[in-house]
Amino acid sequence: MNILSLRLKNFRNYKEAKISLSPNMNYIFGENAQGKTNLLEALYVLSLGRSFRTSHLTEAISFGSAYFFLEMTCEKDGFSHKLSIYVDKHGKKILSDQSPIKTLSQLIGMVPIVLFSSKDRLLISGSPSDRRLFLNLLLSQCDPQYKHTLSYYHRALLQRNSLLKTKQISTLSVWDEQLATLGAYLTLSRFTCCEQLNQLVQKLWNNSLSEHIRIKFKSSLIKQDKLSKESIIEELRKQLTSSLHRDLELGSTSVGPHREDFTLMINDLPVSQFSSEGQKHSLLAILRLAECLYIKNIHNVCPLFCMDDIHSGLDNHRISQLLDLAPTLGQTLMTSTHLPHQTLSKNSRIFLVNQAQVSIHSHSIIK
């Protein structure tokens, strides 16, 4: 799948704009606060129905406007498709070829996307919920059953927590059983995903042969000698029962997939404590590349790969590696404050953004 064009109306600092994209590299440069990141955000909102910059989409409406409208035209299997989203103070309306999309579950996965941005530092220094979100978004784009199971799990969790708060334990076992069955699928999916990402990350991380990079998945439900859905169901049943007294005191559920986490490790030491800032940034870029390859392996199609402000935190050597890999990653968008130093691949397109005006920039660095 390739995105042919992006249209924006009343989105951030864009009153109205339409951009035709290359199916390969799209390099977007310009000074700070001109609207480069807003273009990536628009694509992210269209793909996932949410922003990576705010939890309230209405905050992206241009000052003085009552709504924003975004539309992308895509090509898949030789056919053209349109995906649009309209947001105002009353809510949002999403259309796919003029047919309403009523839930985000329907939307997620239609246009797979991977974003590398400064907020990725939360995967190292943020809370467990930041890292669970990373896995949830990745798996939801690849596995329809995962996103539905995740939704049902959270509904069951809310019901159980409500009963715990009101000390109504007579029907608790019904929700315990649902959490155990649903939770086991989530945990096993996350564990398997981390193992596959580990293989991809290690192949991509060629900075030093002596460095071993891995994602250490942390779950009290995983027992290495009993790694199956059935064993995880049984373990979660036991933990829900044994933690009941504590859960009643807390008024919430203290065990389960909603407590899981992962740690990025280098040579079996936490990256958060034993790596330089440059090393951390490089590792996060590699993790996002691995995410692209993971989605490609599942869907047999490359996701849209967006990299924001690539010259912030990455050295020229790592940027060169990213640019060299870009042709194998499908459609890519990079933003920066200046032109690339490296030669871009054939059919790349360079855009200059100045005060929300986007123009094609011709430059000799394209082969």
From Swiss-Prot:
ATP binds at G30, E31, N32, A33, Q34, G35, K36, T37. Pfam families: SMC_N (PF02463). Its main location: cytoplasm. One of its GO terms (cellular component) is cytoplasm. Keywords: ATP-binding, Cytoplasm, DNA damage, DNA repair, DNA replication, DNA-binding, Nucleotide-binding, SOS response. One of its GO terms (molecular function) is single-stranded DNA binding. GO terms for biological process: DNA replication; DNA synthesis involved in DNA repair; double-strand break repair; SOS response. The keyword DNA-binding applies. It is found in: Cytoplasm. The RecF protein is involved in DNA metabolism; it is required for DNA replication and normal SOS inducibility. RecF binds preferentially to single-stranded, linear DNA. It also seems to bind ATP. Belongs to the RecF family. HAMAP family: RecF (MF_00365). This is DNA replication and repair protein RecF. It comes from Chlamydia felis (strain Fe/C-56) (Chlamydophila felis). The lineage of its organism: Bacteria, Pseudomonadati, Chlamydiota, Chlamydiia, Chlamydiales.
